[in-house]
Amino acid sequence: MIELLVQARKDAGLTQVELGKRLGQRQTFVSKVELGERRLDVAEFVAVSRAIGIDPHAIIRTAEADTH
């Protein structure tokens, strides 16, 4: 799912710094999430999705479809 969030961020034209600002976090938070060094809890996943401008349910549906 993280790969989908990274691609969505890039498609939205957002840098890690810009996404971090939207979340009230530093760029290092975004980097660690994207590198798999830090996991997101459900609330953080929803916040990141919304900050990128995508529906969190759409990310989940896409991830589920990719595994089947």
Task: Specify the residue positions occupied by each region the protein language model found.
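Key DNA-contact positions within bacterial/archaeal DNA-binding proteins
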Residues: 17, 28, 38, 57
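Short, basic-rich loop-to-helix N-cap that marks the start of a DNA-contacting helix
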Residues: 37-47
